From Swiss-Prot:
UniProt feature, compositional bias: Polar residues: 1-12
Gene Ontology CC terms, in alphabetical order: tRNA methyltransferase complex
Source organism: Neisseria meningitidis serogroup C (strain 053442)
Gene: trmB
Signal sequence region: none
Name of the molecule in the record: tRNA (guanine-N(7)-)-methyltransferase
Pathway linked to the protein: tRNA modification; N(7)-methylguanine-tRNA biosynthesis
The protein's Enzyme Commission number: 2.1.1.33
Stretches of the chain forming a coiled coil according to its record: none
Record: residues binding S-adenosyl-L-methionine: 70, 95, 122, 145
Length: 238
């Protein structure tokens, strides 16, 4: 299923690069007038269209500040808050859902944020084709879809092959920060990250929530359901 044409960013209609298994499902979602207006008026300033060739992030941001990749930002509320808390850091935020893209662009405008750029595309393809090796200082993946049913676990984003694609993009000394409210997925995340010799856990197992990460709607929902929340922060050591 794909989003309707009026919910698309200018680059959405291009031919994709098919993969056999995706970690997301595109759902028909309602785009508010304000979200669509934000896309129409702000995309040229804060959006980055997908291309199958490497991109110069410093040129796109107009700065050489540290660069953080955020994969899956939902409605963008936490992303905007983190960018406010870390004004000397640039954030490349990627998601596939139109209303969230529009909402984050609206928040960028409302909060006068200059340190966020937005992409609406499959993050795996962006990592594979657009990001240069050693271009990232950090990677945030907060509350990715846990795909609860066992037969769907193959759709989970955090698996060794994807981490292997991410690692070359991360500078030595850079970090990967994951968070989930699904305990079994947290265990899988811990096992996957621990399997890489080039990554070192900053905690014994799960890390305290860093000060920069605000509570997301997914976290609040999980707490209401009685779930715990697990943060993992691993540093690239070589």
């Amino acid at each position: 299923m794909t989003d309707t044409a009026e919910n698309q960013t200018p680059n959405d209609r291009q031919a994709g690069h098919p993969r056999s298994i995706r970690s997301f499902v595109l759902r028909q979602s309602h785009m508010t007038a304000a979200q669509q207006r934000a896309i129409d008026t702000l995309w040229d300033s804060f959006g980055i269209d997908y291309q199958a060739t490497p991109v110069d992030l410093d040129a796109n941001f107009g700065s050489n500040r540290p660069k953080i990749l955020e994969i899956g930002f939902g409605m963008g509320t936490a992303t905007a808050e983190i960018a406010l808390r870390l004004p000397e850091t640039d954030f490349l935020a990627i998601d596939v859902h139109g209303p969230g893209v529009g909402n984050l662009l609206k928040l960028i405008n409302e909060n006068h944020l200059e340190n966020i750029r937005v992409m609406r595309h499959d993050a795996v393809e962006v990592v594979e084709n657009m990001l240069q090796d050693g271009s990232l200082d950090g990677i945030h993946i907060f509350f990715p879809d846990p795909w609860h049913k066992k037969r769907h676990h193959k759709r989970r984003l955090i698996q060794a092959p994807f981490i292997a694609k991410l690692l070359p993009k991360l500078k030595t000394g850079g970090y990967i920060h994951l968070a989930t409210d699904w305990e079994e997925y947290a265990q899988q995340m811990l096992e996957v990250l621990s399997s890489f010799d080039s990554l070192q856990n900053t905690a014994t197992d799960y890390a305290p929530t860093p000060d920069y990460r605000p509570e997301t709607k997914f976290e609040a929902r999980g707490k209401r359901l009685g779930h715990g929340v697990w943060d993992l922060v691993f540093k690239r050591i070589r």
